[in-house]
């Protein structure tokens, strides 16, 4: 079918009276392996479909670039067209391996491809977003109308016919320009026997220059504009993210640290303390250097219950009394201690009972211990975990421990997002 639509297909068919290239070109559906790709040079051979360089056929196998997104299959398969139509069988009788169209030698035995099957894997036909994509016959480019000459941009104008181009396909242009505004429609061909087409207006005689940065996609995909950090708005149908990672998104909420708050002075206990004061600690000074914890517990436990500390596992005494005797760097007692009651009222009354009390020749002094600033709540680093909110595994924030004395692991915390088998 070298003359589909009165075109000159394979080698040497006469020029038809309709003007050279007309609508089809090189071979119609079967002849010349060129699809509708325009003026097939030497039919089925190397530069199939007068396009080669961007139009109807890649470089000789039936399919070739033409239209579609980036020549045939968006650049993925070179100019081999869609499918397996250009595959060739190894000429070696003992081999018989079927090779891909783009190979120039047998993948199995290394024999050279027979003449007429060389594929231009590097001439993919300009790609871009095309109305006219040559090669619709055998799974060709994903173009539009298959007019093969009526594309949006003819890359070359060399007197006779335009290459079955694609939008933005230059001659031997690898990656056609993505995302450019379509120019005005090409002029209707004049059937005056000459087969010539006027050059497209507004684009000159040369191919479209390649884009300076490969940051755009087809117009319908809306690729990111400006790489990874920009906030430029994206254009197009599917709406690519503007600016890549975190581009244009709201900044992460900054948690105010506890130190950022104005440190207000903690009110200390004095003679005006009422029943609402929760300070249960007393400070004892001028103690004898050999004082023991049991002595202080027996003495001060006469007016109230001395508090206990729930110790971690492994200690001999799991519930020691909450009494701290201070020592110096060498471990010697300094003569002062701190004791905590269970009831704050007992602590407030301890000074009236034991201040200036004489213990082995030393008059001890008993005052209310200073209240320290409240501790910052310990938020979990996961920011709320499974239950959201502030910290902790189930939200709610705050300290999830069972008391305020580092009481060991919380059995309800489960160690994060670990799965529980039972």
UniProtKB/Swiss-Prot annotation:
Subunit structure of this chain's protein: Component of the TFIID complex. TFIID is composed of TATA binding protein (TBP) and a number of TBP-associated factors (TAFs) whose MWs range from 14-217 kDa. Interacts with TAF4, TAF4B, TAF5, TAF12B and TAF14.
Region (Disordered): 1-24, 47-94, 111-263, 368-422
Species for this entry: Arabidopsis thaliana (Mouse-ear cress)
Biased composition (Basic and acidic residues): 134-156, 252-263
Zinc finger (RanBP2-type): 84-115
Gene label: TAF15B
GO cellular component: chloroplast; nucleus
Every RRM domain range: 280-371
Protein name: Transcription initiation factor TFIID subunit 15b
Gly residues: compositionally biased ranges: 8-24, 47-83, 123-133, 219-229, 236-247, 382-397
Pfam entry (one): RRM_1
Keyword Nucleus: yes
Tissue: Expressed in roots, leaves and inflorescences.
Superkingdom as given in the UniProt entry: Eukaryota
SUPFAM superfamilies: Ran binding protein zinc finger-like, RNA-binding domain, RBD
GO MF annotation: an example: zinc ion binding
Keywords: Activator, Metal-binding, Nucleus, RNA-binding, Transcription, Transcription regulation, Zinc, Zinc-finger
Places the protein is found: Nucleus
Known function: TAFs are components of the transcription factor IID (TFIID) complex that is essential for mediating regulation of RNA polymerase transcription.
Family statement drawn from the similarity comment of this UniProt entry: Belongs to the TAF15 family.
